[in-house]
A protein has these predicted regions:
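Catalytic cores of the polymerase beta-like nucleotidyltransferase superfamily
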Residues: 1-222, 229-270, 276-414
Length: 414
């Protein structure tokens, strides 16, 4: 556990949630904050420099001098020799509008009240900073032992439907299963969904569920192997009809091996693809929208607040099957990998693989300067020439620059 131990005898400081869960599972947790039973803002003002405060939620960030008599830490040390630590006040919440952000009812509530607002019992464990004692009000230790995900009350998914997606994330990350009654509650909600919910939060959970398998993520500190659990997560996403949170339409799992495509063509660390036909730099082979490869198959993503780039990825997926190498190349030469893989899943896997395996590295050596040297004046005709040369090179990638110039010479008399 990457923590800071503060010398405090009040026994009011606790680690709560994922950090306790991860420690008990023997996993590293990089996102660590400390909860104070009471008002953390008032408490922290006594011993450190307050650098950020959110009074609405009772959270505070404090810069604490890294002196041995005050604290013992493995956290990053600041430039002035201090440690920055996040503290949270215990708080109780309610959901006056189901499916949307909760409202803070009380800051400085009891520890029991604070843990009762959590999603699953395994995330409702508390550990005393002072004594190291584990406090378990809801049976989280037993569920952790039995690898079960259990909600804290029957209204949990109604209050916050995104907990269903988080359950999927925890199930595949830790190899856990929904406890029987929790599974029943989930199934009931997915049959009677209230689509008046915060889709900004839905999108956030979808990204955190599918994205971490391919890119660095704070919860891991390093990328997991590509495709390590993405396929399992996707299968559960479809089989359990969790996709119903996004669209009421029925969806069948594609016959294409989605996990295999992602594993082969998406790298954990972004790296440039080969340049295009005229020297354009290709987009990276793995970007921040890999999650769209999975969610994009739903078709109707109108409820999700997509960025311009994310919407473009979807809009750029060809509606029809591309029939020639030239069409494949011209369509995908500047496309993102997510667009190409969505085309593979939805339209033509063979064509997409052919482009990625055989065509995308092909580039022209001839340039506009070469055409000027031949006496061809700059005009829209240049693009016609480049396209004809490209067609020839797609048929025979071994042709040289000299061969390309010979093809261009055919247009001297035009």
């Amino acid at each position: 556990m990457n923590i800071i131990k503060i010398n405090d005898n009040s026994n009011k400081l606790f680690y709560i949630g994922g950090v306790v869960r991860d420690e008990l599972l023997g996993r590293e947790s990089l996102d660590v904050d400390i909860t104070y039973v009471g008002n953390a803002i008032e408490y922290c003002s006594k011993f450190g420099e307050v650098v950020q405060v959110n009074p609405d939620f009772g959270t505070v960030r404090v810069a604490i001098p890294s002196h041995p008599s005050l604290c013992d830490t493995h956290s990053p040390i600041g430039t002035r020799g201090e440690v920055t630590v996040d503290f949270a006040s215990t708080r109780s919440e309610s959901y006056p509008k189901k499916g949307h952000l909760p409202v803070v009812e009380k800051i400085g509530c009891s520890l029991r009240e604070d843990v009762m607002r959590r999603d699953f019992t395994i995330n409702a464990l508390a550990k005393s900073v002072t004594t190291g004692e584990i406090v378990d009000y809801v049976g989280g230790l037993e569920d952790l032992k039995n690898k079960k995900l259990r909600v804290l009350h029957d209204e949990s998914f109604i209050d916050d439907p995104t907990r269903i997606i988080r359950g999927l994330k925890f199930a595949t990350r830790f190899g856990f299963e929904l406890e029987e009654h929790t599974k029943k509650l989930q199934d009931e909600y997915l049959v009677n969904i209230n689509y008046d919910m915060s889709y900004k939060r839905v999108k956030k959970e979808l990204i955190e569920t599918f994205q971490p398998y391919y890119t660095p993520h704070p919860s891991y500190g390093h990328p997991l192997p590509v495709g390590a659990r993405g396929g399992v997560t996707f299968q559960k996403f479809i089989d359990q009809k969790i996709y119903k949170l996004v669209t009421p339409n029925d969806v069948e799992i594609p016959k294409v091996n989605v996990e295999g495509l992602v594993k082969k063509y998406c790298t954990p660390h972004p790296s440039p693809l080969p340049v295009g036909a005229r020297g354009e730099e290709k987009p990276p082979s793995c970007s921040a929208a890999i999650w769209l490869i999975y969610v994009g198959i739903l078709g109707d993503l109108s409820r999700l607040p997509l960025t311009k780039i994310e919407q473009k990825i979807l809009d750029d997926v060809p509606k029809e099957v591309l029939k020639s190498d030239f069409e494949l190349y011209k369509t995908f030469q500047n496309a993102r990998i997510e667009t190409i893989l969505l085309y593979a899943i939805l339209k033509d896997e063979v064509g997409a693989r052919h482009y990625l395996d055989d065509l995308r590295e092909i580039k022209l050596d001839i340039t506009g300067k070469d055409l000027q040297t031949l006496g061809i004046k700059p005009s829209p005709k240049y693009q016609v020439i480049f396209d004809e040369v490209l067609k020839a090179k797609l048929q025979n990638p071994k042709i040289t620059k000299t061969d390309e110039i010979e093809i261009a010479k055919k247009y001297l008399s035009d």
